[in-house]
């Protein structure tokens, strides 16, 4: 694992992204509720997914599900620009306040159905989906750049597979299973 990623992980206070009633649990490696049936992912999984995206400062990333903004901070730290889409306005607004307070100026925010992506700014070199669709979101595949990587959980509630989806120069798409996971369900066209 990249040393800079681990250093950032240890320097970022997860409690900044959690409501007061759960702050004492922020140090635990487990998901925690953030409202509306959504969760902040466990820290080890955030680091794992970020590492598999293979980010650098020239990368443009589409994030589906801003949530608390915790994962967004990792993306913003290691990429050129982040486009993040959140369905729930109050979650998106809180995340934006947190990320603005941390000084991130390379994030663009959108309120809407994340399963549709953000076509106006496509293609993206990397896409991260932080909630699980039941079927592959074709709109997101279409917005993935050639030689791009998408990480997403896929499957029914309670049991999904974390996949790495790659697209080659010719547009051929390949899926690789990374882990068995349990994410909240993605709400939108692909649910």
Model-based region annotation:
Residues 1-62, 66, 70-78, 91-107, ...:
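Class I SAM-dependent transferase core
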Residues 54-170, 174:
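Conserved nucleotide-cofactor-binding alpha/beta core module
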């Amino acid at each position: 694992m990249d040393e800079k990623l681990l250093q950032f992980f240890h320097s970022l206070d997860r409690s900044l992204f959690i409501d007061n009633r759960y702050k004492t649990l922020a140090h635990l490696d487990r998901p925690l509720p953030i409202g509306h049936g959504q969760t902040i992912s466990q820290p080890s999984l955030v680091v794992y997914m970020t590492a598999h995206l293979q980010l650098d400062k020239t990368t443009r990333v589409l994030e589906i599900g801003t949530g608390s903004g915790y994962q967004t901070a990792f993306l913003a730290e290691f990429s050129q620009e982040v486009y993040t889409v959140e369905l729930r306005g109050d979650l998106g607004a809180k995340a934006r306040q947190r990320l603005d307070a941390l000084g991130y100026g390379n994030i663009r925010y959108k309120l809407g159905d994340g399963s549709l992506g953000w076509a106006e700014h496509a293609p993206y070199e990397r896409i991260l989906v932080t909630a699980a669709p039941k079927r592959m979101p074709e709109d997101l595949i279409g917005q993935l750049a050639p030689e791009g990587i998408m990480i997403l959980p896929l499957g029914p509630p309670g049991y999904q597979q974390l996949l790495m989806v790659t697209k080659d120069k010719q547009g051929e798409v390949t899926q690789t299973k990374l882990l068995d996971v349990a994410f909240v369900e993605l709400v939108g066209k692909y649910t």
